Each structure stands twice: as C-alpha cells, then as structure tokens.
C-alpha cells in the first residue's frame, strides 16, 4: 500500500489571543513590521526565509477542548542568536518556558510563553542553514 499523503511544508502556524489588538501590537513590535493580512478575528504575518505564515486568531474561536495553559507542540523558529532573541522576548513580557539549552554542536533551543499564552520556540539550527544554502544553490 502506498502512502498518498504528502506533507509538503508548513503553510500556517496558528496562535490564539483573547486580546487580538494587544497581540497584534506585541507581534508587530517583535517582528518590526505589520501583519500583511487582516480580517475580523484574525491577522497574519509572513516570516523568515520561506515566508511561513503565522496567524493569530481570536481565542473565542478556539476549539472547546483547548488547554487553558500552555501545552502542545512547540514550533521552533530559526534565529541567529538564541540568547539575544530569548532576552528580547523576555523584555517584551514573555515568560520562560525553557531556558536556552545546547542540544549538540550547532543546535541551541529555547522557548517562551507570549503574553497571550502561546508557546514560541526559537532555535539556532546548523542543519536549517545547510538546507537553506542547498536550496539557494539549486
């Protein structure tokens, strides 16, 4: 039996916020630019080397079985300096979920909880840079 499902890449990462305007202001300050798409109850940024989408949805629309506290999968965004990014996030009101940890040569991770209860992972990933470079050469 062949696998007919092919995951081709992340298309949108969704966060929730009870105060959408405060979340928009916070993430706009973090990224240094405004969302590229907005509609009532939702806004979206395009980020990084692959222009991944990060959408923030009014928490009124969250599934009824959503956790009340941070939980679930952590999506890690590549950054060039984990410690500096971690400190910036904390200075903006995020709280520590996991301090920076070296996972091996060329791999450092950390994560915070944003002021709206979402886990935001950051990572320096040497493999990510190698893959990105190979894509540029192709």
What is the predicted role of each segment?
Residues 1-10, 34-78, 86-113, 124-138:
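Vicinal oxygen chelate
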């Amino acid at each position: 039996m062949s696998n007919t499902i092919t995951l081709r890449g992340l298309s949108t990462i969704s966060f929730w916020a009870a105060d959408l305007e405060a979340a928009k202001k916070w993430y706009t300050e973090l990224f240094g630019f405004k969302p590229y798409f907005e509609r009532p109850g939702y806004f979206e940024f395009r980020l990084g080397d692959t222009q991944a989408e990060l959408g923030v949805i009014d928490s009124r629309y969250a599934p009824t079985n959503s956790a009340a506290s941070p939980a679930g999968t952590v999506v890690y965004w590549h950054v060039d300096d984990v410690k500096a990014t971690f400190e910036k996030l904390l200075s903006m009101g995020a709280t520590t979920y996991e301090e920076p940890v070296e996972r091996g040569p060329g791999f450092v991770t950390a994560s915070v909880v944003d002021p709206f209860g979402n886990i935001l992972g950051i990572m320096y990933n040497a493999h990510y840079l190698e893959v990105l470079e190979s894509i540029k050469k192709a």
